[in-house]
Amino acid sequence: YTVPHLETAPYPIISFGQGCEGEPLLMWETIREAIIEIRKHTQKGSININTNGSKPMAVEALMQAGLNSIRVSTNSARPDIYTRYYQPNNYRFEDIVESLKVVRRYNGWSSINYFTFPGMTNSVKEYEALRALIRETGLSMIQWRNFNIDPDWYLGKMGVTDTGECLGIPQMMALIREEFPELKFGYYNPPAERMLHFDTDFAH
């Protein structure tokens, strides 16, 4: 069904990893073979992976096979805040940064699934870290995601009692957009057509 979908559907996209089925990079060899087989039959459509970005070498192998885009989930652009929440096993925050950089080196589309928590996400420290992440990775898109989490639990887990100086969320977004005009904001992984012409209305 995958190849006919990519061949005939309007603005087709397929994804590995949907957030509720485990980390797809743990099966990257299988995914690579699947992408190779798909691309034997069609070059149409976009192949995406939703991931924690923990294996840059695996991401590179998938890009070589024909992957088009990646979405890496993170609660923060700061290594310490990321680590307290994700408690990564056998990888570090630096690995997800490298995965984003790998995708851009292959001219792919790189997004972060950015869990947005007012009082943390819009702190001045986070804003500065996000700017640095965008510059370092050449990020294509931020998917600003409402962080559906118990706030008391989260702040306790982060060990945060004072978030420091904060911007408003709209102000932070406006400042990021002004500094990085090529960076896109959104909520979903775009199809290949929208990657090329992002401001075109593809909903109708």
Residue ranges of predicted features:
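Alpha-helix N-cap and loop-to-helix initiation/capping positions
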Residues: 26, 30, 87-94, 122-126, ...
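Conserved strand-turn element in the central/C-terminal portion of the radical SAM core barrel
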Residues: 86-89, 99-126
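Generic structural signal for hydrophobic
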Residues: 38, 62, 103, 133-134
